[in-house]
């Protein structure tokens, strides 16, 4: 049976168009710190590492090691990997720690080795695995960190890479919170022979991939040493991505300089502050609020659609949830009440 070519597309791969509301708006170069111009100490404070987790330790242990290696106060990871699982583990640092929330809607990709408990013709394996694309129902495993309630999850694609006897190597793109071990168990049941997961590696977490940004713990130790002991920051800088990388896939609203400080001081984003935005924003969407220099200001929930933000002259456009930008990067440009 011929293997169909599978389109490997996650939600993070969706291309979005930008529409401009105010073409005359400009940004003052004296204010803010664009990602590419941040001093190394600031780059760390607002950074995220695309870490290659080794098999063995828990995700929590790996994050603790990163904190110790880099002498940090805070760090958090995006999407727990079981101890035996290796691969892409985004680790957000210091003031960027909460940005991992943005990775939830982005989708994840794994390469898995499934071992069947009986012989099955190749064409049947391919046909049955294809049936698992789309919405599936799962119950988290016994040792899961969440309550064991039935829930639906999306499988965006399954691409069989190799079949050798009872071993099936495949690549799978899934919604966050999908259990690959459970998926393999159900594929085995559907094939009538049973199956278990022999090996698993995460190859993507939204915008974070197995590419030149992926670093190991050994790399981190070396690069940190080069910077601290030898004054060479180039490698260490490349090992840390700006927090803006973690929101690449989100719908965005860009705001004028005069609105930035208000948002960093706790105000929701009002329509007059909007300069441009992505098409297709729906009410309730998680959106990233950006400056005109492409700095992340905050994450929030859209209170209007793209069309409403373009048409209206007042009202709340985004209900701000998490603010990342410090209050002193842009000046207060509103008048205090007497």
UniProtKB/Swiss-Prot annotation:
| Keyword Isomerase recorded | yes
Q: Does the keyword Isomerase apply?
A: yes
Matching entries from Pfam families are given as: DKCLD, PUA, TruB_C_2, TruB_N
List the GO molecular function terms.
pseudouridine synthase activity; RNA binding; tRNA pseudouridine(55) synthase activity
Which biological process, per GO, is one annotated for this protein? Answer: mRNA pseudouridine synthesis
Which residues are catalytic? 82
Q: Could you tell me what reaction this enzyme catalyses?
A: uridine(55) in tRNA = pseudouridine(55) in tRNA
Q: What keywords were assigned to this record?
A: Isomerase, tRNA processing
Domain PUA per the UniProt entry, residue ranges: 250-325
| Enzymatic class | isomerase
**EC number(s) on record?**
5.4.99.25
Q: Which NCBIfam families match?
A: CBF5, PRK04270.1, unchar_dom_2
User: What HAMAP family does UniProt report for this protein, alphabetically?
Assistant: TruB_arch (MF_01081)
What family does this chain come from, according to its entry?
Answer: Belongs to the pseudouridine synthase TruB family. Type 2 subfamily.
Summary of the function given for this chain in its UniProt record: Could be responsible for synthesis of pseudouridine from uracil-55 in the psi GC loop of transfer RNAs.
* Annotated protein name in UniProt: Probable tRNA pseudouridine synthase B
Organism taxonomic ancestry: Archaea, Methanobacteriati, Methanobacteriota, Thermococci, Thermococcales
The protein's gene is named truB
